[in-house]
Amino acid sequence: MLNLRFIGPTGCLLAGSLLLGGCFEPAKPKESATEEKRIRLAMLQPPRSGLTPLSDDAFKLSRWSNAETLVVLNANGDAEPSLATEWQQIDDRRWRFVLRQGVIFHDGSLMTAQSVVRSLSAAIHAAPKPRILDGVELSIAAEGDSAVVITTAHSDPLIPQRLSSPQLAILAERAYAANGVVNPLQAGTGAFVLTEINGTSSARLNRFDGYWGEKAAAPGIDVSFVPDSNARAAALRTGSADLVEALPVSQLPLIDARLIHEVPMPRTNTLYLNTRLGAFRDPAMRAAAAAAVQRQQLVDNVYEGRADLAAGLLGPALPWAASLRQPQPAIQPTAVKGQTITLATFSDRAELPEVAVYLAQQLSAAGFIVKQEVREYAHIEADALAGKFDAFILSRATVLDSGDPVAYMYSDFACRGSFNIAQLCDPKVDEALTQAAAIPAGAQRRQAIIEAESRILATHAAIPLLHERVLQGEAVAMQHADRDPRERRLVTPRSVISAGQPRS
C-alpha cells in the first residue's frame, strides 16, 4: 500500500548500537536461511527536495534502480541503450531517439512517446533547470508512438550523454502535479518501486515484477538516511546495515577489512596557481612550485593511503585517460629567492586545511615565504575567482552530469571560463578545448581531451595532487552492489543478500 509519511530527521542519527539496530532493521520474525532478505541501505545525505528528480535527489532514485533515463553511460562515458534502444543525429541540431517498447511504469501505465515528452519538458521548463541543461536550449516532440525528436538551438554532440543524467529520468504522468511538484512515488520504470518516503529519515522500495529488464534478485530495499558518519560505520560494524555509503577513514580500524571497498572518484585535489598576478605570473616560478610538491606525503599523511597520486587532471575514475596520456615537455624551474605567496583553501572539506599545512611546508622548503588563508567556502570563493590569492587548493569534480570532462576543463582553464581560479588565458589551451568540444563522443574525443589536458598541464596553472576515493561498506552477505565512480548506480537488479552468509 502506498504510504507517504513525514517523520522528524533525528530518528536515525544516534550512534548507539542498540538504537541503530532499531533504526535499520524494524522488529520482525527471525529470517530463515532460505528466506529472501531485503537490502538495508544506509545513505549519507537525506533528500533535500522530497526526492524530486529535478534536484540532486535524482541520484538517489538512480542508485536505487528506481527511476531510469533514455540512455546510460558506460565506463568510457559513451551512451548505451536504456529506455531508448537507438538514436541518430538527423542534422546539426536534431536527434531522434527510438523508445523501448512494452515499458510499464510502476503505477501500471505504459510508457509512450508522450510520457517522454512530458518528463523532459518538465525538466526543460523547471526553475532552476537541472545542471545538465545549464546554458542548453532545446525542445522535444513526439514522432508517432515510438520515438521522440530533440531539437537544440546550437549543434551539441553530447545530447545522448546529457540524456543520461538522473535528473532527466522518465516518470509516469501521476508524478507531475499542476503546481510543478514532481512526486516519484510509484512513478518510475526501474527494477524497484518506491512505496514510502518517510521525510528525511527513510524510504522503502519493493521489487517491481513488471520490470522490462532483468528482475531484481532482492525483494526490496530499506533505506535509512544517516548523515552522522560514525553512526553509518557503527551500522555496518554491528550488522544493522548491509550496504553503507561513505565510511569515514577514522572508523576504519574498527571495521572488518573485508567489509571495506574503495571506489575511485572523478574528483581531483588540485593546487591552482594565479597566472595573472603575483609570483606565479612567471611560468618558471610555477614550475618551481610544481617541482616542490611531494604528493606521496599528502596521500600517506592526510588521506592515510586511501587516495591515488595524480599524474594528470583526470584520474582512475576515468580508466581511459592514463593509457592515452603522453610525457610532456617540462618548463625549467627558476630559482626561488624568498618570494612571498598566499596559499588559500576552505574548511568545509576537513582534509583541505591539512593539505594546506603540508603544502606550505613543502613550498617553504623550496624557498617560498608562505602565508596561509583558510575560510569557509561561502566566504572565500569570490576572492579565489577574483585572483586574490597566489595559490588555491580545491577538491574539484572533473566530470559533471554528462560524464565528459570538457565542461570542467573549459570552466576552469579557458580564457572565458566561469571558474578560472588560475586566471589562465592561453590561446593554445583555448584552441585545444574548442577542438575537443566539437568532436562527438568516442575515442577521437577522448584523445582530444587528453591533448587539451596536456596543454593545460604544460602551463603549470594547475598542479594535480591526488585523486580521491570514497569508501563503501558492504556486509559479507551483500553481493553485487555496484561500485560506481559516478555515483549513479548502487543497488542493481543483481544485488542480493546471499542465503546462508552472515550479514556482518
Placement of each model-derived feature along the sequence:
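Ligand-site clamp/hinge motif
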Residues: 208-253
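Long beta-strand-rich cores associated with HINT superfamily self-processing modules
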Residues: 472-504
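N-terminal lobe/hinge region of extracytoplasmic solute-binding protein
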Residues: 42-91, 121, 185-187
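Surface-exposed binding/hinge segments that line
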Residues: 88, 94, 131-174, 196
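Alpha-helical secondary-structure segments
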Residues: 112-119, 147-149, 190-191, 218-220, ...
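Structural transition elements
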Residues: 304-337, 347-354
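Extracytoplasmic/peripheral linker and loop segments enriched in polar/acidic and small residues
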Residues: 24-25, 371-372, 377-380, 410-476, ...
